[in-house]
Amino acid sequence: CALPIFEFGSNYQVAIHLYTFEQTYVYHSNPEEDAYLTTIPHEKRFDDDIHFLKDHVCYKALFQNLDRSYLEQLEQEMPKELHDVLEISYSSNRYIEFNPKGVNKGAALRTLADHLSIPMNETIAIGDNINDLAMIREAELGIAVANAVPTIKEAAQHTTVADHEQSAVAEVIETFIL
């Protein structure tokens, strides 16, 4: 699925990240994204060749642009064939993320809880952006941090006083667990 996503994204003004188990490949980067990328291991590519990935599992892709409305318009223009096979979400007001259908944080929470023999009615999820929506809905208690996007606040049963940079997780632990 990496090739169709890559070809589609190449028609837009976005940096493209392709994630394999071995490496993150970044195409069409920009100064804002270069600054962020100093924090993660990656290989910056200066060509448009992704055929070397044909024997690799590309488990995630994302497009980056600082204009969220531009990314939303891009999603509207995405072919139905891609929409049908992808989970699409947004994060950090700069990314549109693509995972295979059924791969999302809600499914991950359910898998982890099952693996650890934790009943779902004992789970709490904390989120701030659209990529957390499935997890917020799946958990017994969905919590939005103070600076969460409106969609997350609407889906959550509780909103913290603190934001994601001000100990929101500690607030949740103190309020609901201890």
Regions found by a protein language model. Give the residues of each.
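Conserved acidic, metal-coordinating active-site core of Asp-based
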Residues: 8, 12-126
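Short, small-residue-biased leader/transition segments that mark boundaries at the very start
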Residues: 1-3
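Mg2+-dependent phosphoryl-transfer enzymes with acidic/Ser/Thr/Gly-rich catalytic loops
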Residues: 97-178
